Amino acid sequence: MSAFAHGTTGRARGVGVFFKKDANIEICQEELYQFIKFKTEDITIFCLYVSKGCDFGKLVQSLWNYEFNNKNENTYLIGDLNFDAPGNNYLSHFLSRSEFKQMVSRATHLDGHILDHIYVQEARSNLIEIKHHHVYYSDHDGILVSVKKEDIL
């Protein structure tokens, strides 16, 4: 069985996730950012959409409020962050200090920027495979993230 959760605050803003019904879902909806925390017994994924003009300090505080970077969890942060990686802002510095590594290494947007990010705990970065694929319905690439099974046991 599967279900769908979404967080959105307007046209062309928001995030959606398909998930197994046994997953725990929490949604944060602010005007300039939205995220869904998707958690199973094996993995925790934060799926984000960040609008231009976002207060990254406020976003980081929201991530903390939703227990981002619990060292006991296998945590990933993915999404359209609307800044070119590697970035030089409060969020990118927070993730670096928290020992997360940005895994996307080539442009994901038609303008030639890396706007879609995947952050993984550095200790698990060798267990992740990233594949880009072009989609006809978006100006962003589709990104497939594969996690090696031994990482979630």
Question: Whereabouts are the PLM-identified features?
Answer:
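Conserved active-site segment immediately N-terminal to the catalytic lysine
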Residues: M1-A3, Q102-M103
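Generic preference for hydrophobic
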Residues: S2-A3, I45, Y119
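A short, structured active-site edge motif that brings together acidic residues
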Residues: S2-G10
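RNase H-like two-metal-ion nuclease catalytic core shared by retroviral integrases
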Residues: T9-V15, A107-H117, D139-D141
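Active-site regions of metal-assisted phosphoester/phosphodiester hydrolases
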Residues: V17-T108, R124-L153
